[in-house]
């Protein structure tokens, strides 16, 4: 099965929600809680004519609404618009932010991933309550940022309110657009 426009995916682990700990503790029982939806998908098929690097079997980090269920106007639980059938979903190329190909995570333009810097590291800006504001380390750049001279591991400054947190391989990362990177420090 192939789509002319969409990636055909299934949720990693066959789970729509990632709302339990390794010990079985339920973190959230609400279907409306976007913070516990599964954010990872396995590629079943790429779009017809797709010429990129992603192949079936690769893992995508997807938008929180891809696998989410909702309650309609009548109170009936329904899948969101990405659902195709059973555990199969169709996603557009703007609904994934990172992909794992040959064991390596990569970011497609216009997205990149920045690791926040905690206050234990040296920095000019210090906030005793959390991570350094508006500063991080470029964890996964993209071809556009690389063409501008940035590389993974560079310390960067980014625009306020541009960070959107994900947990990738146990590490907190901010997904943001390439245009949100302001300065290489």
Where would I find each of the regions flagged by the language model?
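Acidic-enriched and Gly/Ser
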Residues: 1-185
């Amino acid at each position: 099965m192939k789509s002319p426009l969409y990636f055909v995916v299934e949720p990693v682990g066959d789970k729509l929600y990632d709302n339990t700990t390794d010990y079985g503790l339920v973190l959230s029982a609400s279907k409306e809680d976007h913070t516990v939806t599964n954010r990872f998908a396995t590629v079943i098929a790429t779009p017809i004519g797709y010429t990129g690097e992603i192949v079936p079997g690769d893992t995508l980090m997807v938008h929180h609404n891809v696998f989410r269920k909702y309650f309609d106007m009548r109170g009936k639980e329904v899948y969101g618009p990405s659902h195709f059938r059973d555990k199969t979903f169709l996603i557009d190329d703007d609904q994934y932010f990172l992909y794992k190909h040959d064991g390596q995570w990569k970011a497609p333009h216009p997205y990149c991933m920045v690791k926040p810097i905690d206050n234990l590291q040296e920095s000019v800006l210090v906030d005793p309550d959390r991570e350094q504001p508006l500063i991080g380390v470029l964890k996964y750049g993209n071809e556009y940022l690389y063409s501008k001279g940035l590389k993974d591991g560079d310390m960067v400054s980014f625009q306020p309110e541009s960070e959107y947190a994900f947990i990738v391989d146990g590490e907190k990362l901010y997904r943001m657009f390439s245009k949100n990177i302001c300065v290489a420090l």
